[in-house]
């Protein structure tokens, strides 16, 4: 059994693509219906008024307005104030 892998062989050389998660529109920013507000894994932020949630937990605006972050029942929620 060789204890070296041989010429030009390496176990490295892979790197997955970045996920581009996070808050895309911050509090007070104007949004148009359909704008993505937060991209996340799981429900770190929950949808509030005029905010929808996609199957990958992405939060998006349902109406035009401005973004407002808050806390309701010990949950972080995102609202769009028309």
Swiss-Prot record:
GO cellular component, one term: cytosolic large ribosomal subunit
Region (Disordered): 1-20
KW Ribosomal protein (keyword) present: yes
Gene Ontology biological process terms from the UniProt entry: translation
Residue ranges, compositional bias (Polar residues): 7-19
Keywords: Ribonucleoprotein, Ribosomal protein
Family: Belongs to the bacterial ribosomal protein bL27 family.
Protein name: Large ribosomal subunit protein bL27
Annotated organism of origin: Bifidobacterium longum (strain NCC 2705)
């Amino acid at each position: 059994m060789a204890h070296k892998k041989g010429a030009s062989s390496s176990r490295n050389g892979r790197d997955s693509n970045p996920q581009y998660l996070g808050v895309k529109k911050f509090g007070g920013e104007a949004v148009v219906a359909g704008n993505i507000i937060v991209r996340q894994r799981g429900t770190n932020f929950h949808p509030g008024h005029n905010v929808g949630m996609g199957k990958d937990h992405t939060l998006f605006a349902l109406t035009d307005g401005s973004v407002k972050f808050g806390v309701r029942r010990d949950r972080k929620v995102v609202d769009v104030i028309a």
